[in-house]
Amino acid sequence: MKRRLRAYKKTVSIVNEKAIELYKGLGIEKKGFLLEGTDKESGQYTFMGVEPNEIIQSDKDSLVITRKDGSREVREGNPLIRLKEYFDEFEIVKDPGELDFIGGLVGSLGYDYIRYTEVLPDDNPDEIGIETIQLMLADKFIAINHTAETFTAVVLGEDSEEGRIKALKEAEELIKTAREGVDKFKDDKPDMSLDGVILKKSDTLEQYSKKVNKIKNYIKEGHIFQTVLSQRWTIKTGQSGFNLYEKLRELNPSPYMYYFNFGDFEIIGSSPEMIVKQSDNKVYTCPIAGTRKRGATKEQDIALEEELLADEKERAEHVMLVDLARNDMGR
């Protein structure tokens, strides 16, 4: 039986509140998420919420749903199939002029997600013990419109008069809670001191160099087009993931920044790139390839941009990424 829900909203004007302050007001110690956009010109939103009613995680060959009251439901079978079944249980009634996002699942899908659809070797050791699917049900959250300078409390509730009254009351309480915390954290600056100690690197320079040469040979022989070669560093620090996120957004502000607190672990990141987006019946991809340093002046920026566009290698790599993305989308 489908859960028929409607998005109920209350919108207020921003009065000198910053997104990071509003999130702190909701409670950084709670499980929650912050999806932060900073580009006002493109009309980006910031979304945030805490204390999700349900957390959805894979556990080897099953999907586990942990509810706010502590109860757990285990659904055996391919986690991707079970996730699709879970998603299909919801029906959200959309009104005209809705926000692009009015509720649903937010979180992280690891690289091993592909193993749910492809048969591939699986001989990489699991060094961190975090399962592939890590999602939260965002059914009560705040959406900040950076262009209109407003923020909206969104609550998914039953599609009934009783549901409407209850949801709007929760929306008002959400706004009140966020705003009450703002004064406490007003103009609070992140601690930029460094206390990290590197405990482990996944590769030495020699090991990493050998892998690079191996990849080059695979490309020359036509076995692969591209490999994203990464290295994991394990660092000991006394700071929380949110402290590190605050530093990251100061040092590397980007159009797409994210913070997830799952209780046992936190995920942070910052990216200039929107990989894939679905809007109604259209799918968009915007891969980025090639980089240049920033110039000291606007004229230097333009010159570096023209240099990048004229670089045959960079253009070829970008075309390859677009083709790969298009092929994947076509599947």
Label the model's feature ranges.
Residues M1-R331:
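Extended alpha-helical targeting/anchoring segments
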